[in-house]
Amino acid sequence: MALKSLVLLSLLVLVLLLVRVQPSLGKETAAAKFERQHMDSSTSAASSSNYCNQMMKSRNLTKDRCKPVNTFVHESLADVQAVCSQKNVACKNGQTNCYQSYSTMSITDCRETGSSKYPNCAYKTTQANKHIIVACEGNPYVPVHFDASV
């Protein structure tokens, strides 16, 4: 009888732990969100004027509204993560966890056009080589927010 009670108690504890942990299992981490929204290592540069229209849609950045501005970085994830140990600068919001790349990086800026209207979001594609500024958090310290390019 005691063994049966112990087994039932163990199962109850396991179920309660699963219920508590389960909601976070499907949640995208800030680092994964940064990668989805800003990383495009497979492309060395914007390949066409339609690049932003395609990428913004495929990365779910036009799901509920037209995101006004977004930047894609065409460098390796390791190179972008390395920025978190480079030049410390103030973020636009005043936080102190932003870092500027020592070297320029290949980026594509996507800006919503005046004729854009949800759900038919339209973007202007601009290719550039600039220093990037990212906010970093966590352990390991990784990019979680694209702050600017200069």
Swiss-Prot record:
Gene assigned in the entry: RNASE1
Catalysed reactions, as listed in the record: an [RNA] containing cytidine + H2O = an [RNA]-3'-cytidine-3'-phosphate + a 5'-hydroxy-ribonucleotide-3'-[RNA]; an [RNA] containing uridine + H2O = an [RNA]-3'-uridine-3'-phosphate + a 5'-hydroxy-ribonucleotide-3'-[RNA]
Keywords: Disulfide bond, Endonuclease, Glycation, Glycoprotein, Hydrolase, Lyase, Nuclease, Secreted, Signal
UniProt enzyme class: lyase
SMART domains reported in the protein's UniProt record: RNAse_Pc
GO molecular function ontology, one term from the record: lyase activity
Source organism of the structure: Bos taurus (Bovine)
KW Ribosomal protein (keyword) present: no
Family of the protein in this entry: Belongs to the pancreatic ribonuclease family.
Entry-linked PROSITE patterns: RNASE_PANCREATIC
Disulfide bonds: 52-110, 66-121, 84-136, 91-98
Places the protein is found: Secreted
Designated name of the protein: Ribonuclease pancreatic
Glycosylation sites: 27, 33, 60, 63, 67
Keyword flag Hydrolase: yes
Impact noted for substituting residue 38 to A: Loss of activity
Annotated substrate binding sites: 33, 36, 67-71, 92, 111
UniProt note on tissues of expression: Pancreas.
Task performed by this protein: Endonuclease that catalyzes the cleavage of RNA on the 3' side of pyrimidine nucleotides. Acts on single-stranded and double-stranded RNA.
Any one of the GO CC terms: extracellular region
EC annotation from Swiss-Prot or TrEMBL: 4.6.1.18
InterPro entries noted in UniProt: RNaseA (IPR001427), RNaseA-like_dom_sf (IPR036816), RNaseA_AS (IPR023411), RNaseA_domain (IPR023412)
